[in-house]
C-alpha cells in the first residue's frame, strides 16, 4: 500500500493525518454516526480487509452516537471483514458508539482510563400518517430488540438486564465498562498492546 503512505496532493493537514493513520490500519470514528461517516468507515474497513485479511484493524471511537441504520451498516461490515477489529473507547462512546465499541473482536476491546460509555434505548422519531407511524414503530421495535440481543451477546449480560439497564441513560466509567463486559482491557500506554493483544 505504498501509494497510501505518501500524502496526496491537495489534502489538508487533517486529511493527511487520517490518511497516514489509515496506512497503519487505524480508522477513527470521531463524530456523530451518520450515513456519510458510515460510508467512509465501511469503505475503509473493506479496503483494509482486502489488502490483508490477516492483520487487525484498529477502530478508535469518540462519538456521541447517531443513526441506527448507519451504525448497523458499520457493524455488519465489521462482521463481514475476515480480520479482527480491535476497538478503543476514548473520550466518549455513547449510544451507537457504545454498540460499535462492544462489537469489536472479543479480547481486543479497550477503553482509555477516562473514557465514558453510555448505554440507553435506541432513539427514533416517527412522522407521517397514522399508518406510516404504525409501520415505523413496528420496525423500530424490531431493531430495538435486535440491538438488545446483540448487546447481550457482546457483554455476556442477559437480554433482560440489558433492557432494564437501557431504560434510561446509564453511564459507565472505564472500570465499570470493563466489569459490565463492554470492553476487555483498560489501557494507558500503546506499548502494552502487541498485535492487538493487551500484555
From Swiss-Prot:
Subcellular location per the Swiss-Prot or TrEMBL entry: Cytoplasm
Keywords: Cytoplasm, Hydrolase, Protease, Serine protease
Disulfide bonds: none
InterPro entries: ClpP, ClpP/crotonase-like_dom_sf, ClpP/TepA, ClpP_His_AS
GO molecular function: ATP-dependent peptidase activity; ATPase binding; serine-type endopeptidase activity
E.C. code: 3.4.21.92
One Gene Ontology cellular component annotation held by this UniProt entry: endopeptidase Clp complex
Family: Belongs to the peptidase S14 family.
Function statement: Cleaves peptides in various proteins in a process that requires ATP hydrolysis. Has a chymotrypsin-like activity. Plays a major role in the degradation of misfolded proteins.
Subunit structure: Fourteen ClpP subunits assemble into 2 heptameric rings which stack back to back to give a disk-like structure with a central cavity, resembling the structure of eukaryotic proteasomes.
HAMAP family referenced in this protein's UniProt entry, alphabetically: ClpP
Protein name (Swiss-Prot/TrEMBL): ATP-dependent Clp protease proteolytic subunit 2
Organism: Mycolicibacterium paratuberculosis (strain ATCC BAA-968 / K-10) (Mycobacterium paratuberculosis)
Amino acid at each position: 500500500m505504498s501509494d497510501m503512505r505518501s500524502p496526496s496532493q491537495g489534502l489538508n493537514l487533517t486529511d493527511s493525518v487520517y490518511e497516514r493513520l489509515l496506512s497503519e490500519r487505524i480508522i477513527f470514528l470521531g463524530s456523530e454516526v451518520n450515513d456519510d461517516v458510515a460510508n467512509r468507515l465501511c469503505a475503509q474497513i473493506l479496503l483494509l480487509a482486502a489488502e490483508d485479511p490477516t492483520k487487525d484493524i484498529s477502530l478508535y471511537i469518540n462519538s456521541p452516537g447517531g443513526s441506527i441504520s448507519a451504525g448497523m451498516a458499520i457493524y455488519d461490515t465489521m462482521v463481514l471483514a475476515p480480520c479482527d477489529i480491535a476497538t478503543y473507547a476514548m473520550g466518549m462512546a455513547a449510544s451507537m458508539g457504545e454498540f460499535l465499541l462492544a462489537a469489536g473482536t472479543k479480547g481486543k476491546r479497550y477503553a482509555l482510563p477516562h473514557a465514558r460509555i453510555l448505554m440507553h434505548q435506541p432513539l427514533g422519531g416517527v412522522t407521517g400518517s397514522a399508518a406510516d407511524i404504525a409501520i415505523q414503530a413496528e420496525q423500530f421495535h424490531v431493531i430495538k430488540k435486535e440491538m438488545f440481543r446483540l448487546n447481550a451477546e457482546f457483554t455476556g449480560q442477559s437480554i433482560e438486564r440489558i433492557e432494564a439497564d437501557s431504560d434510561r441513560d446509564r453511564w459507565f466509567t472505564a472500570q465499570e465498562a470493563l466489569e459490565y463486559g463492554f470492553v476487555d482491557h483498560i489501557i494507558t500506554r500503546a506499548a502494552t498492546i502487541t498485535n492487538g493483544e493487551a500484555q
